[in-house]
């Protein structure tokens, strides 16, 4: 079974060092719709703008031993492919190709950035 971990990007401060588990606990996220998160309490449901983007660890490490998260930008050392990791159709995959990450060997992949701090890499 893979380890479940998250990281969070704080939009207003452009900071990736946010403790995602604390964000999740503090905000009690139920589900996401656009840029609003819907919460539930005993008094009823309400929504609010959410200032964090939460990304999940995919359970793999790159060739340097760095954890890979959705939103990371990967480079394949053999094909020179550069693309981002996304979650689609119940699996983590490479965005443009749509190929599941199982088609790539993690020892050939390197995290070179992420979509928030390094969008120019795409």
Residue map of PLM features:
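Secondary-structure transition motif
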Residues: 1-122
């Amino acid at each position: 079974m893979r380890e479940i971990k998250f990281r969070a990007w704080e939009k207003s401060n452009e900071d990736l060092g946010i403790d995602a588990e604390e964000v999740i606990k503090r905000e009690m996220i139920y589900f996401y719709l656009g840029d609003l998160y819907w919460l539930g309490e005993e008094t009823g449901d309400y929504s609010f703008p959410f200032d964090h983007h939460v990304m999940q660890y995919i359970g793999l490490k790159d060739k340097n031993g760095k954890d890979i998260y959705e939103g990371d930008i990967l480079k394949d050392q053999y094909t020179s492919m550069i693309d981002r990791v996304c979650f689609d159709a119940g699996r983590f995959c490479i965005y443009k190709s749509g190929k599941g990450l199982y088609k790539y060997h993690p020892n050939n992949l390197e995290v070179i950035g992420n979509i928030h701090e390094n969008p120019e890499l795409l």
